[in-house]
Amino acid sequence: MSTARPCAGLRAAVAAGMGLSDGPASSGRGCRLLRPPEPAPALPGARLLRLPESEPVEAASPERSGWTEALRAAVAELRAGAVVAVPTDTLYGLACSASSSAALSCVYRLKGRSEAKPLAVCLGRVADVYRYCQVRVPRELLEDLFPGPVTLVMERSEELNKDLNPFTRLVGIRIPDHAFMLDLAQMFGGPLALTSANLSSQASSLSVEEFQDLWPHLSLVIDGGPIGDSQSPECRLGSTVVDLSVPGKFGIIRPGCALENTTSILQQKYGLLPSQGSCS
């Protein structure tokens, strides 16, 4: 397991008074920000890097340079055991190496999250799911839903850190439909633990400004611009969480932002049956 830095500036009051939620819904790759990456030390603790307005295409462009800078900075912090704030296809999240037990503990402390609540695992490719999970559905099903605003819960493999959600044999997998997160997960090369960027019991975040109270306790904040409409409650629903651990069935753990499309694919295309008690 990797060695983690202590959470920057963690205070006892923060550890005592925070809580969590896993949040909003929005469109896929559309993180928008107006300026190229630059450090902005508005608060002590976190370095802020702003992504280009759109995913860079030209290899030699300033946008590509800024995109690469942000990726390298995030990977370096994650490999050092730090906690990084990142944009996804649904909301802003907190990411750390799932292989670093100290970093996992740091995430729980700074959010004030109960350690009885699981963290999701973010991966960069469908092929990676087979390394970290016991997959009992067709690969085509995974490819229909990933990347996208869903969390698929399956039985975990022995490859995952035993300190990650030690109270359950299951793990939720995310492959966000967000260009930066896909690049980050692939460049990092291992499982990332992912949860929403907010204090426990508070609303999930659609912009970096909405979780500024966490900045002093983070090493890096990646600003991808606003995600969705902050005035719309639907934009804070978070990913749709589906239990696929029982062969031939599915269970909706959280309806989230993609319920209708997800259940349609599972039932109509793959013939899965909703499990008893599922809210589908």
Swiss-Prot record:
Membrane topology of the entry: Peripheral membrane protein
Primary localisation category: cytoplasm
Source organism: Mus musculus (Mouse)
Recorded name of the encoding gene: Yrdc
Name listed for the protein in its UniProt record: Threonylcarbamoyl-AMP synthase
Signal peptide: none
Catalyzed chemical reaction(s): L-threonine + hydrogencarbonate + ATP = L-threonylcarbamoyladenylate + diphosphate + H2O
Binding partners and assembly: Interacts with RSC1A1.
Pfam families, alphabetized: Sua5_yciO_yrdC
A Gene Ontology molecular function term of the record: double-stranded RNA binding
Family membership noted in the UniProt record: Belongs to the SUA5 family.
